Amino acid sequence: MWPLWLVASLLALSQALPFEQKGFWDFTLDDGLPMLNDEEASGAETTSGVPDLDALTPTYSAMCPFGCHCHLRVVQCSDLGLKAVPKEISPDTMLLDLQNNDISELRADDFKGLHHLYALVLVNNKISKIHEKAFSPLRKLQKLYISKNHLVEIPPNLPSSLVELRIHDNRIRKVPKGVFSGLRNMNCIEMGGNPLENSGFEPGAFDGLKLNYLRISEAKLTGIPKDLPETLNELHLDHNKIQAIELEDLLRYSKLYRLGLGHNQIRMIENGSLSFLPTLRELHLDNNKLSRVPSGLPDLKLLQVVYLHTNNITKVGVNDFCPVGFGVKRAYYNGISLFNNPVPYWEVQPATFRCVTDRLAIQFGNYKK
């Protein structure tokens, strides 16, 4: 019988999309569980699968770096003050945890022989230099977590087997064309917390990628980046400096289920902009500078959650959220947040929320000048 901690770790690594995981590994930022877990979204989940637990048989190898904990095919070397990747790592290792150390460089032979490595965790080190051949031996690597380091560029020659890349909280200012070439299996990139501006994305930077999830939060974006993958189901651009959403900004993202634009400076959403998102279910526009409810919400038949709190909205019309007359909405709202807006909620007509599942799903009040 496999130890519970190992099974839980493997399942978390293999199935979790890019939201907060707490416990043994701290890989991510600050969101909840992915919404893409129902029948219509099942196709958006990662296709990487779970590692074959039957293959994790004890090897009883004496190879274990000094100070590390090695069990089955998991090597944990976190929080040891390491200056470099340790030697004597068993070649059959599948999970290698090197987070919270002082590693500053990845050399050409650091991962030599680790052909079975599935997940590599390098979070919270001081890595600023990566040799172009450092990842060459990692033929089966699917998860690379290299957030909270000192990188100024996306690492070269990433393994073609890679499914998930977490590279947030570094110093990256540019995403050049071709940097992701050959990564046909990639479906998740987390690159928030880098000083990226719109001009930092070269045309064709994401060519060839079929991403389900992309987060570029806490950057320096002033608009929605152009030419992101059309396959996206989730796009998170929160905590930027975006000021407006223009008609063509969302034209190519018809497969979005969740769009995160909270904590920006958005004052204007051009009429018709949201009409290109027929499958949208969750829309985050909280903590912006909107003066009215965006037009087009009643036409989004699958929309269930809208965050509009902490804006400058002064009025809510009776047809701002729900279709008129016999208009069909396939999924009723289960969450509309309007609190911390100067809306006289006692003047809002009850029929405004005729397509909401429960009155408790509507959040008003708590506005302070």
From Swiss-Prot:
Keywords: Disulfide bond, Extracellular matrix, Glycoprotein, Leucine-rich repeat, Proteoglycan, Repeat, Secreted, Signal. Residues 17-37 form a propeptide. LRR repeats lie at residues 83-103, 104-127, 128-151, 152-172, 173-196, 197-221, 222-242, 243-266, 267-290, 291-313, 314-343, 344-369. Disulfide bonds join C64-C70, C68-C77, C322-C355. Its main location: secreted. InterPro entries: Leu-rich_rpt (IPR001611), Leu-rich_rpt_typical-subtyp (IPR003591), LRR_dom_sf (IPR032675), LRRNT (IPR000372), SLRP (IPR050333), SLRP_I_decor/aspor/byglycan (IPR016352). The keyword Glycoprotein applies. PROSITE patterns: LRR. Residues 1-16 form the signal peptide. The two attached glycosaminoglycan chains can be either chondroitin sulfate or dermatan sulfate. The keyword Nucleus does not apply. It is found in: Secreted, Extracellular space, Extracellular matrix. Glycans are attached at S42, S48, N271, N312. It comes from the Eukaryota. GO terms for cellular component: extracellular space. SUPFAM superfamilies: L domain-like. PANTHER family: AGAP008170-PA, BIGLYCAN. May be involved in collagen fiber assembly. Homodimer. Forms a ternary complex with MFAP2 and ELN. Belongs to the small leucine-rich proteoglycan (SLRP) family. SLRP class I subfamily. This is Biglycan. It comes from Canis lupus familiaris (Dog). The lineage of its organism: Eukaryota, Metazoa, Chordata, Craniata, Vertebrata.
